[in-house]
Amino acid sequence: MTRLSVNINKIATIRNARGGNNPDLLKVALDCERFGAEGITIHPRPDERHIRYQDAYDLKKIVTTEFNIEGNPEGEFIALVENIKPDQVTLVPDAVNAITSNAGWDTITHQSFLTEIISNFKKAGIRVSVFVDPVTAMVEGAAKAGADRVELYTEPYATSFHSNKEAAIKEYIEAAAAAKSLGLGINAGHDLDLFNLNYLKKNIPFLDEVSIGHALICDALYYGLENTIQLYLRELKK
């Protein structure tokens, strides 16, 4: 079964736009779970422009499905994850000023760094996923560094899906097969939506988890949050 983890960063962005606590991030997280989401994902950044570090502590107290924290493993983020001990940490090499994640790790160049970080998180009992491009060598590097899972960066797939979905999925099938052969779990995320999700799942049937935020929240503006989550779950179960 492929789990749907809802990324609630966009909810925090809306909240922070006006100050105060509307929408209530914690209530939205609980409602996502109540509506069928099988996980909650957040991606705090150093400037706290959407998710605040305090949000992570507050969410840890109430999330009853899988809690996944994404981010660049530096300084305050490392301390945050070690203190909270989420079910999963996803290591993402995003720059401080990046609008959103735009590339996976070079797991060969950063092998020693990742090995140390992953070891420390695993000693704390946290499952570790490494965000990678769909390149077999990068998947192999993540396995060598000790990762439990890889998260395949799906923006290139989403961009090419409508023009040539067979070509768009090819390298993901290969990367996923490599991950499976190495004993890694497989997650996927970035620009997945109601149009391209089912094709990804059908071609990688052993996919463990997808984390979806931006498109899901955009769809919720039209369909409502409960209906939207059910629509995404339906795409994963077709």
From Swiss-Prot:
Molecular-function GO terms, alphabetical: pyridoxine 5'-phosphate synthase activity
GO BP field: pyridoxine biosynthetic process
Positions contributing to 3-amino-2-oxopropyl phosphate binding: N7, R18, D191, G213, H214
Keyword set, alphabetical order: Cytoplasm, Pyridoxine biosynthesis, Transferase
Pathway: Cofactor biosynthesis; pyridoxine 5'-phosphate biosynthesis; pyridoxine 5'-phosphate from D-erythrose 4-phosphate: step 5/5
Catalytic reactions on record: 3-amino-2-oxopropyl phosphate + 1-deoxy-D-xylulose 5-phosphate = pyridoxine 5'-phosphate + phosphate + 2 H2O + H(+)
Record Gene3D superfamilies: Aldolase class I
Record: residues binding 1-deoxy-D-xylulose 5-phosphate: R45, H50, T100
Primary residence: cytoplasm
Physiological role: Catalyzes the complicated ring closure reaction between the two acyclic compounds 1-deoxy-D-xylulose-5-phosphate (DXP) and 3-amino-2-oxopropyl phosphate (1-amino-acetone-3-phosphate or AAP) to form pyridoxine 5'-phosphate (PNP) and inorganic phosphate.
Record-linked NCBIfam families: pdxJ (TIGR00559), PRK05265.1-3 (NF003625), PRK05265.1-4 (NF003626)
Protein name (database record): Pyridoxine 5'-phosphate synthase
Organism annotation: Cytophaga hutchinsonii (strain ATCC 33406 / DSM 1761 / CIP 103989 / NBRC 15051 / NCIMB 9469 / D465)
Taxonomic lineage from the root: Bacteria, Pseudomonadati, Bacteroidota, Cytophagia, Cytophagales
Encoding gene, per UniProt annotation: pdxJ
